[in-house]
Swiss-Prot record:
InterPro entries: Conotoxin (IPR004214). The keyword Cell cycle does not apply. Residues 1-13 form the signal peptide. This is Conotoxin Bu9. GO terms for cellular component: extracellular region. Keywords: Disulfide bond, Ion channel impairing toxin, Knottin, Neurotoxin, Secreted, Signal, Toxin.
Length: 63
């Protein structure tokens, strides 16, 4: 009975560690999705305004 209980505790502990790893991974993924990447001055820009400041439509570059 003691051996069975110990085995169950080990399995539960292992599952708990895996769950914590997945939670940490999901947290990192959310953070990277919230981090916006923008183009700096002089870089080309298009329909999606991906400039840090403003996209000059005539030149199609970031200002």
């Amino acid at each position: 009975a003691v051996l069975l209980l110990t085995a169950c505790q080990l399995i539960t502990a292992e599952d708990s560690r895996d769950t914590q790893k997945h939670r940490a991974l999901r947290s990192d993924t959310k953070l990277s999705m919230l981090t916006l990447r923008c183009a700096t001055y002089g870089k080309p820009c298009g329909i999606q305004n991906d400039c840090c400041n403003i996209c000059d439509p005539a030149r199609r570059t970031c200002t």
